[in-house]
Each structure stands twice: as structure tokens, then as C-alpha cells.
């Protein structure tokens, strides 16, 4: 594995996840989030603290996607198909599976969880493909 390329690809994937999640939650799902916050009488969050938290969270998703791509690349081969597989695996672990675990709390409904899961797949998969495109194995020296 080429750790330097995982870092570079992970940063790119993380930035794409961060921007994409901003669109997902700040535009597409914002009316529902505002309704949930209003129903629970939650005060507005601190934008600076939220920015740092979500930036780190999305970088972690980006690094995980590219690291998984690098790990499965020998079995599945290099290229976008393998990157999509890696992105979908990280998406499943980060979004729909945790949301399924939260459904019994009734904090939000099934429709919202479904929308979040569908919309949330795009930034993770696109980020994984972009980050994986930057990944190359280290050249092996002749023995």
C-alpha cells in the first residue's frame, strides 16, 4: 500500500464528502432538520464548532474510502468499479446501518432516514472514486 497516496486521495475524498454533505444536509434535508430542531426546541448550533466536527468526520470517511480501495484493489483490480465498491462499503457503515439502529428511537422517521441514506451515498461514492483515481501502488524495485 502507498500510504502517501492514501493520504492525498483521502484528503480529496474527504473534501468532496464535506462539500457534498453540506448540500445534502444544508439544502436537500434542511427543511426536515429545521422541523426536527423546532419540535425538540433545540437551540441553533455553533457554526464554527459544527464546521470543524463535520470536516474531521468527512475527512475520516474520505480516508476510510481510499484506504479500503487500496486494501481491496489487489482482489478487485484498479479502477472506478473497485472505488465504487469501497465507497458503498464506507457509505453503508456510516449512514444507512447507523440510521437503521436509530429508527426505534423515533427521533426521525423512516422516510427521512431513507432520503438521508440515498442522498448521502453520492458524496461518499464520488469522493471514493476521485480519491482512488489519485491512488497508485508504489513501484516495486527489481529483486
Residues of each region from the PLM?
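Juxtamembrane/disordered regions of integral membrane proteins
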Residues: 1-143
Amino acid at each position: 500500500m502507498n500510504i502517501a497516496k492514501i493520504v492525498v486521495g483521502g484528503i480529496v475524498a474527504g473534501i468532496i464528502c464535506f462539500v457534498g454533505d453540506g448540500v445534502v444536509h444544508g439544502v436537500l434535508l434542511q427543511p426536515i432538520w429545521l422541523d426536527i430542531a423546532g419540535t425538540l426546541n433545540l437551540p441553533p448550533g455553533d457554526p464554527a464548532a459544527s464546521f470543524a466536527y463535520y470536516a474531521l468526520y468527512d475527512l475520516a470517511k474520505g480516508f476510510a474510502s481510499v484506504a479500503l480501495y487500496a486494501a481491496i484493489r489487489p482482489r478487485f483490480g484498479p479502477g472506478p468499479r473497485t472505488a465504487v465498491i469501497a465507497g458503498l462499503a464506507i457509505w453503508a457503515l456510516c449512514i444507512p446501518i447507523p440510521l437503521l439502529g436509530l429508527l426505534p428511537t423515533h427521533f426521525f422517521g423512516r422516510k427521512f432516514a431513507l432520503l438521508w441514506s440515498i442522498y448521502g451515498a453520492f458524496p461518499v461514492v464520488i469522493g471514493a472514486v476521485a480519491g482512488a483515481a489519485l491512488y497508485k501502488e508504489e513501484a516495486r524495485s527489481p529483486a
